[in-house]
Amino acid sequence: MSDYKSTLNLPETEFPMRGNLANREPVMLKSWAEDDLYQQIRDSRIGRKPFILHDGPPYANGSIHIGHSVNKILKDIIVKSKTMSGFDAPYIPGWDCHGLPIELKVEQKVGKPGHKVTAAEFRVKCREYAAKQVDGQRDDFMRLGVFGDWHNPYLTMDYSTEANIVRSLSKVIDSGHLHKGVKPVHWCTECGSALAEAEVEYEDKKSPAIDVAFAAADKVTLLAKFGVEECSGSVSMVIWTTTPWTLPANRALSVAGDIEYALVEFVKGDKTSSVILAETLVESCMERYGVDSHNVLGKTSGQSLELLRFNHPFYDFDVPVILGEHVTVDSGTGVVHTAPGHGQDDFVVGQKYGLEVANPVGDNGVYKSDTEIFAGQHVFKANDNVVALLEEKGALIKLENILHSYPHCWRHKTPIIFRATPQWFISMEQKGLRKQALNEIEQTQWIPDWGQSRIEKMVENRPDWCISRQRTWGVPIALFVHRETEELHPDSSSLMERVANKIEQEGIQAWWDLDAAELLGEEADQYRKVTDTLDVWYDSGSSFSSVVASRPEFQGHDIDLYLEGSDQHRGWFMSSLMISTAMNGKAPYKQVLTHGFTVDGNGRKMSKSVGNVIAPQTVTNKLGADILRLWVAATDYSGEMTVSDEILKRSADAYRRIRNTARFLLANINGFNPETDLVAVEEMVALDRWAVRRAAALQEELLEAYEQYNFHVVTQKLMQFCSVELGSFYLDIIKDRQYTAKGDSHARRSCQSALYLISEAMVRWIAPILSFTADEVWQLLPGQRDKYVFTQEWFQGLKSVTLESDLSDDFWSELLTVRGEVNKVIEQARREKQVGGSLEAEITLYADDALSTALATLGDELRFVLLTSKTQILDLSAAPADAIETELSSLKLGLKKAETEKCERCWHHREDVGQVATHPTLCTRCVTNIEGDGEVRQFA
């Protein structure tokens, strides 16, 4: 026989080396959809313990970006891994569909409501626009391989959800947390509406910073407080502000009761003035004012100045000095200009002293017609006019322009104002909501754990939540208030339920179409309908109730996990916590996981203007979704997540390593039938048993990492296993046995059994992350099985068996190191043309007693481990001077080129080649494998 190729067990598989994911994945998606795979998964977990991950709804506007992809992929990995762990883990995706951004898009097409279209028509257009946006985003999310109930998602604009949002508000009211008040709120003059804290961004803004003098109304009484009888000129209290436009609303000057204040006389040019400043700020103020000289005439506490009065700098009235806890001496003058209508701290201290909440500014940011001097002027344009008037009145001490952080509208990117308006609030204090929420935060697991202190600080400092908006497209605050007293209707709870029933049938338009008499009868004339809409953060924040309570998958089960970007501590996590605590007295979640933002390779935020945006659609179309999924999983999400073309290229390289490992496994279990060919772990060759044992240990580590949501640990350990323990060691060693042993021999079936068991485990390990590739592998695994890996649980066939005769795991680890040292020597010899390959080498191992004894255990099978034709072990002391040093102090090496004949079939150089006359070019081992019972292997 001259052609021995046919006697070899060469690897064969339909699993291609190249993933071609961009083309192959859409075909799989089609198959998953046709088979209703998500429902198959749901059916496979009926009756199991539930795990509920509640989806934070993205906004239904625009294409998804890389941050959306990170979020949805992380959620998908968790849901799939929990399913593999045996949980019933449904995933109901959602969308946030009301609110200003959608209104603005629709306005661009049809104009503002009430102009070319009615408010009702405008809402229809908003609903149509949002639905179209949902369709586009849904396709993009599904392309990522994310499983979920995509064709039955929750939308905050679903009639049933809108109705349930109204019902949740009713429960908040019943619990006593709602109140109406005139309070300063973040107000966007472009939107013409109040903004939630989460809708406010801070950007740098150039503003006029001014020091303004308020002259004493009673100089004599004031001087007496400082123990001074006389001083030159008038005496003024000085404030520092960066919002000159708020001075028309000034109603007080705030000082700190426990701070020492100084009466300072200073000379500048030919003018002498006396001013009151915080003592610790005197020197910095005098330097800022550029005075020629100054002298402290006296000191007193802020407490002693309470209720003294000072003249408004340009209006004909005086204002009191009041004590405020918000006053500091970090900067400025230590005296705070107080306008209760334009600031939260000002409002709080103003309430304490019964100050007027003056609000001279209209919805559009223009002073109202009854505003003295500045009527009709826009506040930001009026800044210069206020400054000019102060200078004219002699009240301006200093003007300088500064760049500082200032609140901006997240949508318009324009500066906002604080403005007192009648609004509806969820109170943080009147029923102890703040205290209760802080307690619930402690009961929740925060991942990473710094999330707890972050949201605690936010809850400790947050004001009452303004939940009302003056918008068209939103869930109505479905209340009736008395026309004269402004009190809620005493039967509000049942009225809201009746309204909710109508909304459930007709949508939110039902509220605006509703004739009050239909519900109130003869009382209708006494009450008016509230026309405000709810903050969209209320919509999404109440979804634990409005959505989860209405889905049969979630019935009777608490939510286990919320997972969003780190910006949601003040967004969705916060609003959900407030509403759930107000309604039910507890947090809506057991765990909260946050991930960082995506940044480019230089750590910069993604921006179209910078040109550093990486669109997920581009990645999936070019590289495939599994590459994107692997990048997400391999990145530590607890910090910023860096992505670039180079990083994705590295992910593609890592993917190829996993794919090549899977391909080797599949190619070498070709023809293997687990029903008839599976060798029990106890009966395997020792090296195969070690590989199964190592895979079993790895599975424990991977499952723990999945359980702790440490997906980067999963990928690191998986890559290590594929590259080192499998690729560089086990798979390399078994090639000879796999290819040359008799096809159905114990030696080969043992090896195939190990490969099969590892394949069964590995396909499940990668399924939550590399979902497309896992499906591709699953379809080619031998044996009877369900159609999809995603209905399976973690593989239970990995037995961690150690026989008395087995070499220890420590030995195999040491052998892996020895093999690495041998490989280095052979590789050097190849570079120097001493040998053509490892099988041309004969290796001598000079080892100390302990290592010699261990290596000798393998007998002739040591050569198979080292991939050489011949090995011999000698005592370390016998090493010649030219023996090659290794990293191991217990080992030196010698290498020479084999002088024996090369076997045509196995390529080993052996002395017994040609001993069998019928096969003159083969070694006796190969003859046994062709014509006999096959070689016997014990160790490798």
From Swiss-Prot:
Q: Where is this motif: 'HIGH' region?
A: 58-68
Binding, Zn(2+): 903, 906, 923, 926
Subcellular location(s) per record: Cytoplasm
Where L-isoleucyl-5'-AMP is bound, by residue?
564
Q: What is its EC number?
A: 6.1.1.5
The Swiss-Prot or TrEMBL note on domains reads:
IleRS has two distinct active sites: one for aminoacylation and one for editing. The misactivated valine is translocated from the active site to the editing site, which sterically excludes the correctly activated isoleucine. The single editing site contains two valyl binding pockets, one specific for each substrate (Val-AMP or Val-tRNA(Ile)).
Q: Which UniProt keywords apply?
A: Aminoacyl-tRNA synthetase, ATP-binding, Cytoplasm, Ligase, Metal-binding, Nucleotide-binding, Protein biosynthesis, Zinc
What one GO molecular function would you report for this record?
Answer: aminoacyl-tRNA deacylase activity
**The protein's name in its UniProt record:** Isoleucine--tRNA ligase
Function statement: Catalyzes the attachment of isoleucine to tRNA(Ile). As IleRS can inadvertently accommodate and process structurally similar amino acids such as valine, to avoid such errors it has two additional distinct tRNA(Ile)-dependent editing activities. One activity is designated as 'pretransfer' editing and involves the hydrolysis of activated Val-AMP. The other activity is designated 'posttransfer' editing and involves deacylation of mischarged Val-tRNA(Ile).
Motif segment ('KMSKS' region) = 605-609
Family classification = Belongs to the class-I aminoacyl-tRNA synthetase family. IleS type 1 subfamily.
Subunit organization? Monomer.
Q: Which gene encodes it?
A: ileS
Which Pfam families would you find in this protein's record?
A: Anticodon_1 (PF08264), tRNA-synt_1 (PF00133), zf-FPG_IleRS (PF06827)
Entry note: cofactor: Binds 1 zinc ion per subunit.
Is Transit peptide given among the entry's keywords?
A: no
